[in-house]
Amino acid sequence: MSNSMPIASPVRTQAIVNRYFMHAKKNLGQNFLVDLPAIKGIVEAADIQPGDQVIEIGPGIGSLTEQLLLAGAKVLAYEVDQDLPEILNNELPQKIDGEELKDRFKLVMKDVLKANFVEDNDGFLDLSKSVKIVANLPYYITTPIIFNLIKSDLDFSSLTLMMQKEVAERLVAKPKTKEYGPLSIAVQSRMNVRLAEEVKSTSFMPRPKVDSAVVVLTPLLEKPDINDYAFFDHVVKMCFAQRRKTLANNLKTLIKDKDEREKLINDLGLDVRVRPEELTLNQFVQLAHLLKDRQA
């Protein structure tokens, strides 16, 4: 099979699977992306430019990695599947823009949730400068990875992540929609979020049961007035404990007295019958402040 054909093509992917007697591992959430326009869409969404430093999570057989390298990026990749280093080293282009593969690509065999980026990098990328993070995330571990990266000390300019469409819709959801909830608020209180593209299940091998979407997260220029994120997240979760109930009803666990709960809601300029999904991010921030002041 000629390596002039992109890894992302169905023919080349199938040839790689056959050559290495491999299969997609369900326990690792593996589905190989075989849609070159979709992969180029990820690269475009991440705004990859020559010389960019990229951390890739879960390179798989290299479908996305190859396009990142061809776009001019230097890539540090995290992978847990021990069967993949041989495939990546053999199948990725051995020369990119006149440079050896080893000078443009480094593979770290480790769960990214256990990453020590400085030690793992070992001078490969210049971590004194910003990096871009790109990933085709396993569905089962999407949320932990997002929050692990947000809370890390890593200086990144963007996270461009492919994930289950349903999760993507929750990340970008607005108030008064059924997708809006604690995950929407937790992420939007920390990052700008936008939906870049949708990817059909037919773009994968084997075909998953659900469609995917690409989301781009970038640091907020102006962060909300939240001093204690752990408390803020707890308040939001309590407010959505019973989604169909009113905010006043859900606040029972935090404030026993009915009159006091209703006064608190009125102090926010809201009707006592308001439901949690009707509150904006700023109103949740104000609510958390009122509850924190009440504890003081």
UniProtKB/Swiss-Prot annotation:
List of residues binding S-adenosyl-L-methionine: 31, 33, 58, 79, 111, 136
Short name of one Pfam family: RrnaAD
PROSITE patterns recorded: RRNA_A_DIMETH (PS01131), SAM_RNA_A_N6_MT (PS51689)
Cellular localization per UniProt: Cytoplasm
Catalysis: reaction(s): adenosine(1518)/adenosine(1519) in 16S rRNA + 4 S-adenosyl-L-methionine = N(6)-dimethyladenosine(1518)/N(6)-dimethyladenosine(1519) in 16S rRNA + 4 S-adenosyl-L-homocysteine + 4 H(+)
InterPro entries hit by this protein: KsgA/Erm, rRNA_Ade_diMease-like_C, rRNA_Ade_Mease_Trfase_CS, rRNA_Ade_methylase_Trfase_N, rRNA_adenine_dimethylase, SAM-dependent_MTases_sf
This protein's name: Ribosomal RNA small subunit methyltransferase A
